[in-house]
Amino acid sequence: MKKTKNKDNSWYDISKRGDTMNCFFNALFMFINNPEVRDLNYRIALGLLENGHELDYLTINELAERCFVSTSSLNRFFRIYGYKKYMIFKALFSSHLRIRYVQIQNRMNDKDYEMLHKVFSSILKSEDYERLIDMSWVKEVCEMIHNSKRIILIGSDEMASFFSRMQTDFYVMGKLVIKDSIYKTNFFTPEKDDCVILLSMEGRIVDLNSWLLDKMKENNPKMITIGHYDYLQDAYGLTIPQGLDEVFENMILDYYIQKITYYYAEKYL
């Protein structure tokens, strides 16, 4: 049983807050995945995730400055989720990152793609199947991600929801994944050192927002598209063949996400 001391020298059992920390991480990503509402909670969640790997070295005043909020606002945010002492919160946060990293390793060791490959070979054309299982694409995509500061997701809420586990996994591996708005009033322009993943599928998101492609490319970030069409000639395209049942489309999307996550963990950690 792992314990730490409170300021009054009483002992506090860290393991009791494991479930609470899971809920806390879910809340942080919920706030940054709702880019239409950039309120106090959004600023705290984003600032905390941007600086989470440095928490051991930050005082609460320094963290508040980086979140662009007051110390009292930050303390109030922590108390809502049951954390009354910043030192205890920091210990739990760091411990949670280590636990999630071990979980990634366990999932990698237990994963067997043989059955999934059989399903893909039965529903896809031979050229689509060979392209899907060819590992060259995942190497190039992971290299693009590795050489970027952040991953920016642009797409519908429905498609972006598939990336929820990847978002947490990559955060544990030191890479922040942020969902951008698809509306001009709240869209933030990706920076040159970002890697943008455009979830285009049938392309309606592009057809309905004629300004989107130009704004995405404005600072010349690295770009990856996932969907039926490659809207950007200078982007790396991961194709999901047309004419498939929605279940199979989702299976291929999830396959892309898993391969990217596990190869990145194996290659760069």
Name each model feature, range by range.
Residues 72:
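Key DNA-contact positions within bacterial/archaeal DNA-binding proteins
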Residues 136-149:
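Glycine-rich phosphate/diphosphate-binding loops that line cofactor/substrate pockets in enzymes
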Residues 1-35:
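N-terminal intrinsically disordered/low-complexity leader segments
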Residues 23-24, 36-40, 46, 50-57, ...:
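HTH-adjacent hinge/linker in prokaryotic transcriptional regulators
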Residues 146-269:
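Glycine-rich phosphate-binding loops that contact phosphosugars or nucleotide phosphates
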